[in-house]
Swiss-Prot record:
Taxonomic source organism: Myxococcus xanthus (strain DK1622)
Binding positions for CTP per the UniProt entry: S17, D150, I151, E152, K190, T191, K192, P193, T194, Q195, K226
GO biological process annotation, one example: 'de novo' CTP biosynthetic process
Listed EC numbers: 6.3.4.2
Root EC class: ligase
Positions annotated to bind L-glutamine: G357, L385, G386, L387, Q388, E408, R465
Binding positions for UTP per the UniProt entry: S17, K190, T191, K192, P193, T194, Q195, K226
Organism classification: Bacteria, Pseudomonadati, Myxococcota, Myxococcia, Myxococcales
One GO MF term: CTP synthase activity
Spans annotated as Amidoligase domain: 1-269
Binding-site positions, ATP: S18, L19, G20, K21, G22, L23, D75
The protein's role, per its UniProt record: Catalyzes the ATP-dependent amination of UTP to CTP with either L-glutamine or ammonia as the source of nitrogen. Regulates intracellular CTP levels through interactions with the four ribonucleotide triphosphates.
Regulation of this protein's activity per its record: Allosterically activated by GTP, when glutamine is the substrate; GTP has no effect on the reaction when ammonia is the substrate. The allosteric effector GTP functions by stabilizing the protein conformation that binds the tetrahedral intermediate(s) formed during glutamine hydrolysis. Inhibited by the product CTP, via allosteric rather than competitive inhibition.
Designated name of the protein: CTP synthase
A GO cellular-component term linked to this record: cytosol
Length: 546
């Protein structure tokens, strides 16, 4: 009789960071979900910040926003894109959040005068957080951030070590990701870093049950046998995670090696045979699109670190999947647009996207990109700050308010067409205080937005402090700006568009957070469809996209 008690899969990493633990965890979740199991995923981050909301995109990359307003690690985006699990703030815990909870309990006297220590109080809080997020899942996949050996990770590793004894040996497995480097001078793949990484993990008290080795080449059976022997792991539980052209190929690759079957066997989980046809179809459209390619310009501030736009990049890829076309992303530094001009940097692209962001640097370049898209009739999509920059550009270029700006960038502008939300005026703290999470948006019948969504009211995720100033709403509409989406409760502007443009749309929310490869977001599907039409029009006019 196979057990139906909740199973826990703990994923750790060694040797170096950025091995792809998040993608490996998401792939495991996808495979087990395809076998009929209910899965959820949790990310444990060792840093002291309560959440990544106030961290620089250059340090942390994207901040992924959940439905309930959690500002979380970008790996939660992988989890949502690869599985049907809906993430919340309970799916991401940091050292800062854990320690804050422990200290608050101590202040309330919940420890009954005891000396508060890492063991058991901090580790108990970590375990409690894991159980809280587990809910009714058949399988809980817990990714521990950082690298084995990092001092910050020790409380988390101790907590997951204890979990095996708390919930039963048969209900826990440890999956360890390592690196198998190839030394060109020797012509060999070296296993020693993996051996030492496992040794470090065993010193903490964790014996990995599975090894997933990152590599850029095929690993022969003899090498896997060697790794198994030195690391005390069953040969059948040694797998490789090779370099793949698309991250969506990874579940198929791990299934080909039998990882999901082996996990089900070791954990004694009943599961059906996997159905991976839709993954295979996705890969076909990514690798062999039937309709060629389009070139999309992303005009932003963080273009030198594209991880800052991870969900955005993926959502554009999903739009390509929906239209069976390859999407080539052309990242353009908005400050360079200021210096060199939009005509020089954006000529020949099939569509232009201005994403969210913070700070004044490069904003005039974004406004110039909007102007170029509006005047040249190039498909345009503005997200969050991108919508605000579109309103500023329209106010300057169409309304004739040459000094129009956002109060975020010019506190003394005579025409603050974008202003601080009323609820934000008295806010002093930075962390977790923006308008965060899912809010309703009522769509204007007959608008492009209504046509794309096919709904009267939608729910989308937000992360902002500034909004279009309703004092200018009537003037903007009279001049031709269509306000196609509004928050029904506060009457905030949520979506804008231009009726006399092939595709000009802006949204105050972040639709990229809800896009999946199997369910591309309608705004991205429509945007790429418009880019295709622009490409074909350029070709007919003798213009060639680079």
């Amino acid at each position: 009789m196979r057990s139906k008690k909740t199973k826990f899969i703990f994923v750790t990493g060694g040797v170096v960071s950025s091995l792809g633990k998040g993608l490996a965890s998401a792939s495991i979740g996808a495979l087990l979900e395809n076998r009929g199991l209910a899965v959820t995923l949790i990310k444990l981050d060792p840093y002291i910040n309560v959440d990544p909301g106030t961290m620089s995109p250059f340090q942390h990359g994207e901040v992924f926003v959940t439905e309930d307003g959690g500002e979380t690690d970008m790996d939660l985006g992988h989890y949502e894109r690869f599985t049907n699990a809906r993430m919340s703030r309970l799916n991401n815990f940091t050292s800062g959040r854990i320690y804050h909870a422990v200290i608050m309990k101590e202040r309330r006297g919940e420890y009954l005068g005891k000396t508060v220590q890492v063991i058991p109080h901090v580790t108990d809080e970590i375990k409690s957080s894991i159980r809280q997020a587990a809910q009714d899942a058949d399988v809980v996949i817990v990714e521990v951030g950082g690298t084995v050996g990092d001092i910050e990770s020790l409380p988390f590793l101790e907590a997951i070590r204890q979990m095996r004894y708390d919930v039963g040996n048969e209900n826990v497995v440890y999956v360890h990701l390592t690196l198998l480097p190839y030394i060109g001078a020797a012509g060999e793949v070296k296993t020693k870093p993996t051996q030492h990484s496992v040794m470090k993990l065993r010193e903490i008290g964790i014996q990995p049950d599975f090894l997933v080795c990152r590599t850029d080449r095929e690993v022969p059976r003899e090498l896997k046998d060697k790794i198994a022997m030195f690391c005390n792991v069953d040969t059948r539980s040694v797998f490789t995670s090779p370099d793949v052209r698309s991250t969506y190929e990874l579940p198929l690759e791990l299934h080909r090696q039998g990882l999901d079957e082996r996990l089900a066997e070791v954990l004694n989980i009943w599961s059906r045979a996997p159905h991976l046809e839709r993954w295979e179809n996705i890969i076909r459209k990514v690798y062999e699109p039937a309709r060629g390619q389009v070139r999309i310009a992303i005009v932003g501030k963080y273009v030198n670190l594209t991880e800052s736009y991870k969900s955005l990049n993926e959502a554009l890829l999903h739009g390509g999947i929906a239209n069976d076309v390859k999407v080539n992303l052309h990242f353009v530094d908005s400050q360079e647009v200021e210096e060199q001009g939009a005509e020089k940097l954006l000529a020949g692209v099939d569509a232009i996207l201005v994403p969210g962001g913070f700070g004044v640097r490069g904003t005039e370049g974004k406004i110039a990109a909007v102007r170029y898209a509006r005047e040249k009739k190039v498909p345009f999509f503005g997200i969050c700050l991108g919508l605000q920059m579109a309103v500023v550009e329209f106010s300057r270029g169409v309304l004739g308010l040459s000094s129009a700006n956002s109060l975020e960038f010019n506190e003394h502008t005579p025409h603050p067409v974008v202003t601080l939300m009323e609820s934000q005026v008295k806010v002093q703290d930075k962390g977790g205080t923006m308008r965060l999470g899912s809010y309703a948006c009522a769509l204007k019948p007959g608008s492009l937005a209504h046509q794309l969504y096919g709904q009267d009211t939608i729910q989308e995720r937000h992360r902002h402090r500034y909004e279009v100033n309703n004092a200018y709403r009537s003037k903007l509409q009279e001049a031709g700006l269509v306000i196609s989406g509004s928050n029904p409760e506060l009457n905030l502007v949520e979506m804008i568009e231009l009726a006399d443009h092939p595709y000009f749309i802006g949204c105050q929310f972040h639709p990229e957070f809800k896009s999946k490869p199997f369910a591309p977001h309608p705004l991205f599907s429509g945007f790429i469809r418009a880019a295709l039409a622009q490409r074909d029009a350029n070709a007919a006019a003798g213009k060639v996209t680079e």
